[in-house]
Amino acid sequence: MEISFTRVALLAAALFFVGCDQKPQPAKTHATEVTVLEGKTMGTFWRASIPGIDAKRSAELKEKIQTQLDADDQLLSTYKKDSALMRFNDSQSLSPWPVSEAMADIVTTSLRIGAKTDGAMDITVGPLVNLWGFGPEQQPVQIPSQEQIDAMKAKTGLQHLTVINQSHQQYLQKDLPDLYVDLSTVGEGYAADHLARLMEQEGISRYLVSVGGALNSRGMNGEGLPWRVAIQKPTDKENAVQAVVDINGHGISTSGSYRNYYELDGKRLSHVIDPQTGRPIEHNLVSVTVIAPTALEADAWDTGLMVLGPEKAKEVVRREGLAVYMITKEGDSFKTWMSPQFKSFLVSEKN
């Protein structure tokens, strides 16, 4: 099995569709049957719910979706040595490196949100991710030493990466030969937005699409109601609902520290790495959900906020006016917090 972004393959998404897969009830004669297409990409699942398409159209669309997502993976993967991203990473050149417009846009958004989170959302943290065993490298047999961490930190930093936009070509440029860009924190969000654009190109105006924990939507579901998305409780029980939201044509993404981890020397190590310390996070923030104009933005914000921890994250949320829902672990229970902007999307919440 190929895993493109995370060591744990096919993790259950921290967000899932609500009520969009059910067949129309007989009493609701106006309802339109929803077709659900599914597949695998980037070490996780993709899914598309689309009302009112027939079997032939479904088969054609599924093939187009998979082809597009395979291309996205070939663009962004750190597990494919011949991906566009890995060719940049493996190059020691400090000269401008030509990239696609999509790659330039992803990196530009990541750098912007990285700056707004005081460097907490850092796409150059790849050497540390690999050091701790959450990238293509094997898991370490012991916790890395401070010397190893410092050596990897010296190869990171958003200030070492620049996007150059010219009229007909975009470039990435690094000023450290060993700079290693890892876009796994935003790959799902970009792919979900890309799926939404594919739906539009195909003339589909009602859809809910997801890649892993990032979703995008437009229009109404099969019953003529807003698409609803459930946020999972941060437990090992799948599909346990914490809250339900109407995303109303926005992007949504959740970052969680409770699923992708391993234990070493008696310590539970999260896959979320703090660029400042070079170590997995240890605070009590276990889930961050962000609703934003695009899934890419939501995916970038949720990572940065997760790294910051609850109090610093709240400061950024208030300063930037973000729609955010956070869950912290308090002893044996969980506590939730949401920004005023998030409340307008909330349908229900469970204690």
UniProtKB/Swiss-Prot annotation:
Lipidation feature positions (N-palmitoyl cysteine): 20
GO MF annotation, one: transferase activity
Lipid linkage positions (S-diacylglycerol cysteine): 20
Binding residues annotated for FAD, in chain numbering: 42, 79, 120-122, 182, 188, 273
Annotated Pfam families: ApbE
Subcellular location(s) of the protein: Cell inner membrane
Enzyme Commission designation: 2.7.1.180
One cellular-component annotation, GO: oxidoreductase complex
Alphabetical list of SUPFAM superfamilies matching this protein: ApbE-like
Binding residues annotated for Mg(2+), in chain numbering: 185, 299, 302-303
Primary subcellular site in the record, as a coarse category: membrane
Signal sequence region: 1-19
Catalyzed chemical reaction(s): L-threonyl-[protein] + FAD = FMN-L-threonyl-[protein] + AMP + H(+)
Keyword Membrane in annotation: yes
Cofactor(s) this protein cannot do without: Mg(2+)
Gene3D superfamilies recorded: ApbE-like domains
Membrane topology: Lipid-anchor
Family (UniProt): Belongs to the ApbE family.
Task performed by this protein: Flavin transferase that catalyzes the transfer of the FMN moiety of FAD and its covalent binding to the hydroxyl group of a threonine residue in a target flavoprotein such as NqrB and NqrC, two subunits of the NQR complex.
Protein name according to UniProt: FAD:protein FMN transferase
Species name: Escherichia coli (strain K12)
Lineage: Bacteria, Pseudomonadati, Pseudomonadota, Gammaproteobacteria, Enterobacterales
